Amino acid sequence: PTPGPALIWPVQGELLTGFSKDALVYSETMGQWQAHEGVDIAAALGQVVAAPAAGTVTECLEDMLMGYTVVIRHDSGYESRLSNLASLNAVSVGDRVQQGDTVGSVGQSALSEEKLAPHLHYELMLNGAQIDPARVIKG
């Protein structure tokens, strides 16, 4: 794909769990081997989560496994799914956000990852398929 405008990491922190769409990784919380179609980035509870790029908020939902989640469709064609948030109070569906705007804060709402240290679960999609954010975002 043609690279769109640069994306930034929504939080700064150590990578706890990397992207693994094809190779299974063991989930301590779920007690099973499974794909991990995003990345888990260590962050303090309450740490601000930023929009990786400009776009429109398309979903604000409470996912049964991934917790409070905000989805942004970026102008570049990418889509970001930011999960394990503290609440859904920062943005609403239809809001336009610019790169770096606050879209939430880190929480512990993801039941499927509750045994991990506080973190943001971040999925990046292009044309409906999950891709490794580390292959697109530099730094």
Residue map of PLM features:
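Surface-exposed, glycine-biased beta-strand/turn segments
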Residues: P1-M66, Q99
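Soluble periplasmic/extracytoplasmic beta-strand elements of cell-envelope proteins
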Residues: I8, Q12-G18, H36-D40, T69-R73, ...
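Zn2+-dependent peptidoglycan hydrolase active-site motif and core
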Residues: A51-S87
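Residue-level recognition of beta-strand microenvironments
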Residues: G18, C60-L61, L85-L88, V106-S109
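Short alpha-helix capping/helix-loop boundary micro-motifs
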Residues: A43, L88-V91
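Short acidic/polar mixed-charge low-complexity motifs
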Residues: Q47, S76-Y78, A129
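Hydrophobic residues in beta-strands and at strand termini
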Residues: A43, A51, H74, L124-M125
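Conserved, short, structured surface segments that act as functional micro-motifs
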Residues: D95-G139
